């Protein structure tokens, strides 16, 4: 049980005999006492044969103390999820959230078999939201759907301070788990990544997100192994590929594929638990079948053109275009995103016809929208 009076204790660094490495001895029962596994190459940076972590101080004071909040969902509950949708955020013409369209989309995910949603992730454009908007949307999702689907808030940041504050707030409004990326743009060392994740792990179930194409820095396996013993470490959304998925699965670490076009083989051939999916926004039922009904190369091949189309430009450009063409969301884009060109919109209609309109979300026929149908918002 997490101590309500000492959520993030300062670590005591003591030398051990295994080659001069240091161990972190937390004084809180929220983190199991165990030797700290440091990345190779970091064993002798002080010149005294052990790592000095004297400059790392974890704050003792955090405003969210409730053990009731923290124990709402167990980490095991999260590790069992096979289909998690990285859900899109729809907008009104003035740039505000279209909560009616959002609620409808979440209902479609639940009806299609999705077991969890990532709120405010890359696909949901969390990076285009203020933190007030972000936490409001997490809280809204929990309040409306939290008893029917797991709500995983993207509260990660390249700033540890912001990640800590947002994660506190996310769990305070009821999210079941947090998604955390490694510090991007400014980047950090492997040891810095470990300390960054350790600052948020005591708060509740956590999924680590590795997407080097966006963060510009791979999370090396030794970092994941170093934090894998934490009670709240649910697993990794991994975008590097099958070899990395298998590496973690063989070590008993829960892995979700972050690549829709690889998720079938990652699940059935390489040991992934499931997928955190963009495609399931459009065809949740088919993605549920892909994750639950055994190896199915035919279905995977059937979905391949859609998956390829969805990532023809940086996500979520194509998804936003598709949901507008299906009439599920208004054709409103927060800049810098703009819709796909006309020929790609026409291609999507053909893909819908090929897969079958009945497999897609919404009730309206897919149609090719004109350029003038779209609204681009720069102030929101």
UniProtKB/Swiss-Prot annotation:
Active site: 209 (proton donor/acceptor), 237 (schiff-base intermediate with substrate)
Entries under NCBIfam families matching the protein: dapA (TIGR00674)
Protein name in the entry: 4-hydroxy-tetrahydrodipicolinate synthase, chloroplastic
PANTHER family: 4-HYDROXY-TETRAHYDRODIPICOLINATE SYNTHASE, CHLOROPLASTIC, DIHYDRODIPICOLINATE SYNTHASE
PROSITE patterns reported for this sequence: DHDPS_1, DHDPS_2
Reaction equation(s) it catalyzes: L-aspartate 4-semialdehyde + pyruvate = (2S,4S)-4-hydroxy-2,3,4,5-tetrahydrodipicolinate + H2O + H(+)
Pfam families in the cross-refs: DHDPS (PF00701)
Site (Part of a proton relay during catalysis): 122, 185
EC numbers for this chain: 4.3.3.7
Region of interest (Disordered), ranges: 1-44
Function: Catalyzes the condensation of (S)-aspartate-beta-semialdehyde [(S)-ASA] and pyruvate to 4-hydroxy-tetrahydrodipicolinate (HTPA).
Lineage of source species: Eukaryota, Viridiplantae, Streptophyta, Embryophyta, Tracheophyta
Organism: Zea mays
Localisation: Plastid, Chloroplast
GO CC terms in record: chloroplast
